[in-house]
């Protein structure tokens, strides 16, 4: 197998990564500008180039049309500024970059993993994941993280030749950092990072890594994701009028939140109940009790932003300090060590996730809407399957023509649906013959 390896680095941490980490699966010619024959040395690191490729990708832009938590009809029109999967990914990338700079990882590797981590999400988020996993059962199901790998290494058009699709052709280090669940599907396991027909490229990415062990950059990305969505989903819930943190002052509500955290996130129930009580007494939390976006003045909005800033900083600092206490000041890269997240911090994050789950995601009207969304995706999938290849976009129609069997053709239809934004899925479904 021919590999492309780049040298040089715009950040000192890039020099700590060996040739295997810098390698790309497909060889690439020198980058041209179309301005003549003048040749200059590439000053960017390979990891900086990775970041640029993801940042400029259509797959990343599509995340602007995919809801994070609060969407149309759920209070977004009140606050007017709901988060999308794109804004969430930008926040994850920024948080991860800061942690990487503290720990000695290459910031571009972690930043890119943060940008890319949700690229595989289908319309309607985790609800869409569930529908596509059911619809695509005969070809191995669906998982957003496995779809991320597929997009980065195959579906996003950037590098390729002949019958070989290279996707964005990112470095091994960046692809490994993007693997939140570095294992294929095992039995009925819900979370996994690669489909069976992506096994070869997954094997290349993971070559030399301990089975099932995430590199430090992936661990930083994952913690940054937890921090971002636990804090910011609560912020969006407050802005939409669905969350009031005064609920943390109720012992009954704290017990209910601890139960949710235990059941859905594997957290220790007693620890969650304890930290929920402690969170309720934080001055930053007390300052936003009773927040109402319809009446809040500047002081109230400043208090809400102070809360999110303090919580993000709290979780970043706790994890970086604990990791440095264990590993010292030597740079941590690839598989040289693990991120240390103290149990108390993990419990606090689990409680915040449970706040959003209890007061936003478990709303009966939302659950009814989600059932309709799953039905829509099933109907759309069946219609595309019946009408393929004419029902597919031209690129996916090419994939359909090259597919060797029914399972591969089903995977093409799943790929097609997964690429759609929320509104595209609704529009495509509306065009179906009645």
Model-identified regions with their sequence ranges:
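Acidic, carboxylate-rich catalytic segments that either coordinate divalent cations
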Residues: 2-33, 37, 374-387, 398-434
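Sequence-structural signature of the catalytic-core scaffold of metal-dependent phosphohydrolases
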Residues: 2-38, 49-51, 55-66, 94, ...
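Short alpha-helical catalytic segment bearing the HExxH-like zincin motif
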Residues: 110-115, 222
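C-terminal subdomains that position terminal phosphate/3'-OH groups for nucleotidyl transfer/ligation
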Residues: 262-398, 403-404, 408, 432
